[in-house]
Amino acid sequence: TGAGDSPAGYEIDGTALTITDSGTYTVSDSCADGSIKVKKGTTGVTLVLDGLTLTSENTAAITCGKSSEVTILVSNGTENSLSDTEQNNDDNYPENENAENAVIKCKDGSLVTLCGDGELTITANGKNGIKSGATTDEDGEASLTIRDLTLNIDAPVNDAINAEQLLNVESGTLTIDAADDAIHCDLVLNIGADGTDGPTIDITNCCEGLEGAELNVCSGDITINASDDCLNAANSDLTDYDFTMTISGGTIDAYTSGGDGFDSNGELAITGGTVVVWTANTADNEPLDADGTITTATTPVADLTAITVSGGTVLAAGGSSGMGMNLEAAQPCVIYGSTGFGGMPGSTQSSLIAADENFTIEDADGNAVYSGTARCGANFILFSSADVVADSAYTLKAGDSSTEGTAQSGTVSTGMGMGGGFPGGRQKPDGELPEGFDGQMPNGEKSELPDGEVPEMPSGERPTPPSGQGSPTDGNAPAGDSTSDTTPTA
């Protein structure tokens, strides 16, 4: 109920409901083609979904107008479903003036909270599952907050959740299947909060998992299965921005079949939590990749591509693009393999461990400090935890093979070794060289080019390794916001 210009605080035109004043409004039952809209500038609205099944053919199922303040509450113990059709996409249907490109559309300057103890399933046949707008001088601050509820999103066209300004995923249980990004924010994306359990997020399929110009994971239990970057701090529309990725808590179990694990176009900081990230064992994938500083300490190292470990547990494994990395290891770490040139982009590299192989990392006394099962073959493994002691030996055991490594602290360089040879290479169990190989060229001769000369690149230049840049966020440019607040016609 509500009060205002309309006696009940709302208007109904066919199957289109428009909320015009503050109040609590409960919607239930089912509708094959209808819509709910909170009028521009309307604040203090609580929209209760109480067993609602709603499909909208040519616009958003729920629209929160510009400068509105709305709480969408999913009622305890209820199952609710929102969906649209392919017509709710003005890229493919430019003649559709009512298209909002999302099942739930939150316009510029809107403050929207999606919460409750019930379950909501969103099927985005048009474009995005949820789209949140930007902060503007005219419309005010914008944000989207998700907490408590069980939220399932199927987005076979584009993003499951796409925000332009501020996106807080505080708690709840999210299951996402997306054609492009699972959870994307043009600016600030916060997952969980310090001192909380945070959300449970299961991203079963996506191109990129979590993406924001400033990406913070503070708590939660996150599983990601991606075809590109699992986590990405980037925005191709921002040319001068201090991109940051900070992992301070929670648990992340991430795998990508064709991109980087964690990819930051600026700084990458892992200061706590448990991180397990696997990348496909090809020459153009990095478990950890950053253009600025990679760090797990509170103070980044300026102008240095580095990983600094100060807390938490980190297992980063997979392939590499051939770029050497420096590490600031405040908490000691042990590295097996190398990020040195291991092959042409896309080529498969020799593995320290094979896909689905059980492995352990043991200290000098044979105590396991880590054990797991490989998601894929890996020629590079970085491990750090509070149990790792600097200058101590640790052995990676997988099947009948073992690889030795020494934990290091301070500034550590992986060097430019050859695809898995440094700092540790996979050996026969007895540490001997393969049979028939004594480490020398045949006949004891050295390999030389004709006349003993080294070829020069054109103009005397040496080849340049891949840049390590994060993947551009194609398709994630802010979508144009509809300026019309006319009630959609069903």
Model-derived features with residue positions:
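A composition-driven surface/loop motif
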Residues: T1-P458, R462-A490
